[in-house]
Amino acid sequence: HNVYGSDMGNEHVIPEFINRFKHLKTNYFRIQGSGNETRSFIYIDDFVSAFNLLLKKGKHLGIYNIGTSERISIKNLAKMMSDLLNKKIIFKRLPIKKGGTKSRLPNISKIKKIGFKQKISLKEGLKLLLKKV
């Protein structure tokens, strides 16, 4: 999943990167694959707002994707986080995990039709999250 916020565990990209930055002893920052793989992330507050909107306005048995159309490469995500943390990094590429995807971007057209609007950009969400760690 690409929902992020505080206390979300360490199994996904953003919390894993935060953990790596906390324990970074050199400027080398490991990323899997080329770093050009893309994802879309949604801050937990926006996710909850979208879910509540679905409860109120979603069609029974309808399928809705909750997310954003804000796409970012894994390399640019790490760079954004390093800038916010004032850390200089040099990327060290590792093989991509078996079954890894090059791009993940949800089609959110249906949820937008019932009024969903992202309120917290990725950069703003990361700032909020990094204040808490």
Give names to the regions the model predicted.
Residues 11, 20-21:
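Mobile, glycine-enriched helix-loop/loop "lid" segments at the mouths of ligand-binding/catalytic clefts
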Residues 23-133:
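C-terminal substrate-binding subdomain of Rossmann-fold SDR/epimerase-dehydratase oxidoreductases
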Residues 2-5, 19, 49:
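Active-site micro-motifs of SAM-dependent methyltransferase domains
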Residues 1-14, 37-38:
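Flexible, glycine-rich beta-alpha linker
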